[in-house]
């Protein structure tokens, strides 16, 4: 194997399967969220309903995050990932049914909404376990020496699928409707399940058998609070995202303000991932190693300016750029 070979990780069959699996999961999940946001706002025309969607996902995702990390450390990663993908498949099937006109024709709008919220809540639970499981499995698929290369490929696939998922969702809603768009999501989850069968069961490395869960969680929290750099970066990022995120409002902008339809909504939803992917490429050539703190503050300031610009804009292309 050549030194500094950019394709070194791709020479491992299981890693290629892993990339396909991750693409299917991220593509399907991001597409599903777009479809559901559009459907819920179309049903209610109430901004609060979009806030409830976010709340239903974030509550289980955050409340279970530390607990999920502890469980992932204790369990076999492939088997746990299988359960996560199976859970996602069940959620996709449920949303597929509750967007199917013949199935929901006798249900009230409120019943449909509550059912969608329920499946979104289950999705938050699955996501809490899915993230740490994916990263833990990646570390077991490739040798340690090429892990940085594998992580780069994995991150690139994540960014690409994050861009394509929303974009495809927007066009598919317009072309084939919400229900059949959900069938694509269901197909992605089933494909991921099949792909996972090509990855062998991995051993549990250094399991901390019998370690109390509260002790494990306390250790993780203590590490974060004792590391001022990590704590500061996490806090700054959390505040910016918590008070500045406009993503949840995009269906309102797409339907009522910009009037760009589902295709425009998909483009708007994909725009942040496009920006993140471009910055990933830039950072590969211009590493942010010097004055990282000041650069982070500058990025947060620029983020705020973009949010203000987006909020004031009534021009579609300017909103996409923001």
Per-region residue spans from a language model:
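Juxtamembrane intracellular "pre-TM" segments in multi-pass secondary transporters
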Residues: 1-15, 201-235
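Substrate-agnostic recognition of the 12-TM MFS/MFS-like secondary transporter fold
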Residues: 16-36, 55-72, 76-91, 115-173, ...
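A single, central transmembrane helix in multi-pass transporters
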Residues: 31-35, 176-183, 222-278
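C-terminal transmembrane bundle of multi-pass solute transporters/carriers
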Residues: 63-67, 74, 78-80, 84-90, ...
